[in-house]
């Protein structure tokens, strides 16, 4: 099954997450199909906290992809802000 989930990056105590489309059998930080955004939970000042390509997410959901709980919340927040 294809899922849209967060892939952790960044440094110790400074997480940074890529929003990726991946096969659910692959490791969290492993192989992915496409990047569709990012989430920076420790953004300060003018730094961008969230970027989501809603068109690509809708495309993948129409193909049967499942959103993880956290990604679903972030997409909802991004849609409300836009």
From Swiss-Prot:
Coiled coil: none annotated. The keyword Repressor does not apply. It comes from the Bacteria. GO terms for molecular function: structural constituent of ribosome. GO terms for cellular component: cytoplasm; small ribosomal subunit. One of its GO terms (biological process) is translation. Belongs to the bacterial ribosomal protein bS16 family. PANTHER family: 30S RIBOSOMAL PROTEIN S16, SMALL RIBOSOMAL SUBUNIT PROTEIN BS16M. This is Small ribosomal subunit protein bS16. The gene is rpsP.
């Amino acid at each position: 099954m294809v899922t849209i989930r967060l892939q952790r990056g960044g440094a110790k105590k400074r997480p940074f997450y890529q929003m990726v489309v991946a096969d659910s059998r692959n490791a969290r930080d492993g192989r992915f199909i496409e990047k569709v955004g990012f989430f920076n939970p420790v953004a300060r000042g003018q730094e961008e906290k969230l970027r989501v390509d809603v068109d690509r997410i809708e495309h993948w959901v129409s193909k049967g992809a499942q959103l993880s709980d956290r990604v679903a919340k972030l997409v909802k927040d991004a849609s409300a802000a836009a």
